A protein has these predicted regions:
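Short, surface-exposed ligand-recognition loops at beta-strand->loop->(often short) alpha-helix junctions
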Residues: 14-27
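A short beta-turn/loop motif at secondary-structure boundaries
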Residues: 46-51
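Acidic/histidine-enriched, glycine/proline-rich intrinsically disordered or flexible terminal extensions
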Residues: 94-115
Length: 115
């Protein structure tokens, strides 16, 4: 199902983070993501998996928009803060949305129990 608000370009990033620097990584990622929002990013979420891999799901209007934003922020102290905390970085996975049922915050339907 195509949602008219679905981003056309999505990237999944994955890292192994030095355990003692997880807070530093999360802070750097948050600040770097804020800077990218000011340069065309459509938002991102950071997750830590039960496999101790960290994942970020980022949405963009296009790969060109992503590349332009990353070029403008590549030398930021926030990116350096992240790099210092990374034990291993995996290649990004580029995703094309096919079906979209994510709901914006505050728009969740009522649950079956009437909640």
């Amino acid at each position: 199902m195509k949602n008219p608000h679905t981003p056309q370009f999505v990237v999944l990033y994955r890292w192994k983070i030095k355990p003692e620097l997880e807070d530093q990584f999360a802070a750097g990622w948050s600040q770097a993501t804020q800077a990218l929002l000011e340069r065309g990013s459509l938002g991102s979420r950071l997750h830590k998996g039960n496999d101790d891999t960290w994942y970020a799901y980022a949405q963009w209007s296009s790969n060109a928009a992503r590349e332009k934003a990353f070029a403008a922020t590549a030398d930021s102290p926030h990116q350096a803060q992240m790099r210092e905390a990374i034990l291993e970085s995996f290649p990004p996975v580029y995703l094309e949305p096919i079906a979209d049922f994510l709901l914006p915050p505050g728009t969740a339907p009522k649950t079956f129990d009437g909640g």
